[in-house]
């Protein structure tokens, strides 16, 4: 995954301002060990650190205008980095950018994004960064959390909202959308791969008709590489 040395050493709590203004910051680490922070609501920008976050380079504009769609996705097979950018607060047209030089420069690229099993196109907004699967028959797959907005982020529409994921088996050219997360009213999610290849999915839920605390989150898992989700659980600790 890249050199560990920049990230080793004595643990310390350090507060460092990487960017000013706007929202939706996110951080990934590239295959070369570079830390890349992204953010933005008027245009999407990035800053790079090659020393584990001690110092940061100048701002790099990924898209202007642009609205940050969660974090980046690092392809651990090729080293390419993918950025999903919407034109404004979603639902909004989606643009995709790719970096082939460790986040130093970005180019807009065309992709094919397929709808989910309900025929709905996903939004990427307010979800965490994507990952590359490392285990099992789907090793090398790119996957990142996504969501369906049902028209807009309106409280009356929350019962129709749901999270899901998008994934690619051809290095980011074509993306399929997973089946919905098994609970409506969800959004703002993250996922991680476990050592046995199971994908753990954790999502906020704005709408909780059964009376559960809407401030807590819900979890599910996938054993088919992120195509379907099962074992829905109300999280008691997050």
Which residues make up each language-model segment?
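Asp-box/BNR beta-propeller blade signature and adjacent active/binding-site loops
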Residues: 1-238
């Amino acid at each position: 995954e890249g050199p560990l040395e920049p990230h080793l050493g004595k643990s310390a709590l350090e507060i460092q301002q990487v960017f000013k203004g706007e929202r939706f910051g996110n951080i990934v680490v590239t295959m070369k060990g570079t830390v890349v922070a992204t953010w933005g609501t008027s245009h999407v920008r990035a800053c790079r650190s090659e020393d584990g976050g001690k110092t940061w380079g100048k701002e790099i504009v990924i898209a202007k205008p642009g609205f940050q769609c969660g974090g980046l996705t690092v392809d651990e097979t090729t080293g390419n980095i993918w950025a999903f950018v919407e034109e404004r607060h979603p639902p909004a047209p989606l643009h995709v950018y790719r970096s082939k030089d460790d986040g130093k420069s970005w180019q807009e690229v065309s992709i094919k994004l397929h709808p989910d099993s309900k025929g709905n196109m996903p939004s990427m907004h307010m979800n965490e960064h994507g990952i590359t699967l490392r285990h099992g028959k789907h090793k090398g797959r790119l996957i990142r959390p996504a969501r369906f907005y049902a028209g807009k982020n309106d409280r009356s529409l929350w019962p129709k909202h749901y999270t899901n994921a998008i994934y690619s088996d051809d290095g980011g050219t074509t993306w399929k959308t997973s089946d919905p997360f098994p609970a409506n009213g969800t959004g703002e999610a993250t996922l991680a791969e476990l050592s046995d290849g199971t994908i753990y999915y954790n999502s906020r839920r704005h709408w909780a008709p059964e009376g559960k605390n809407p401030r807590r989150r819900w979890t599910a898992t996938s054993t088919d590489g992120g195509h379907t989700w099962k074992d829905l659980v109300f999280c008691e600790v997050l």
